[in-house]
């Protein structure tokens, strides 16, 4: 991660080298690092804001870490501090907004997977995986998304 927003190399090192047990409470730090890196690699000529989605419902809460614009729509970006993690909130957001593509930033390598959403009559959701160390490539990953 090439960040010029102060010396966060220690934080980055902790996230990238921690064990699974260490990562239990590092989700918010991973989200922060990804958000700062996304801002760092956006056009410097325009003021950018980061957006997220939260649904507050009785006895449940759902959130998507970042909502990024692409062409005439949006692409949700989910951040996971490890290689695994549930994505019920992401599926809910995609279902409600009728979206088929998303990005997951995690400790995984580049890749993609497809999810058959049985709650939406078997619609297929496509997720591109962006390693946390490569958040600078999110714009390129979005360009590879088929609309």
Task: Name every feature range the model reports, one short phrase each.
Residues 1-147:
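A cross-kingdom feature that marks ATP-driven nucleic-acid transaction machinery
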């Amino acid at each position: 991660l090439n960040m010029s927003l102060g010396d966060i190399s220690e934080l980055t090192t902790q996230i990238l080298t921690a064990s699974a047990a260490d990562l239990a409470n590092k989700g918010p730090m991973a989200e922060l690092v990804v958000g700062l890196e996304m801002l760092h690699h956006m056009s410097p000529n325009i003021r950018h804001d980061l957006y997220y989605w939260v649904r507050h419902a009785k006895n449940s809460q759902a959130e998507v870490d970042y909502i990024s614009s692409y062409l005439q729509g949006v692409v949700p970006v989910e951040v996971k501090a490890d290689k695994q993690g549930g994505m019920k909130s992401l599926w809910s957001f995609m279902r409600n907004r009728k979206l088929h593509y998303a990005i997951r930033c995690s400790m995984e390598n580049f890749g993609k997977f497809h999810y058959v959403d049985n709650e939406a009559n078997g619609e297929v959701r496509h997720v591109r995986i962006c390693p946390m160390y490569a958040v600078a490539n999110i714009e390129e990953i979005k360009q590879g998304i088929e609309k």
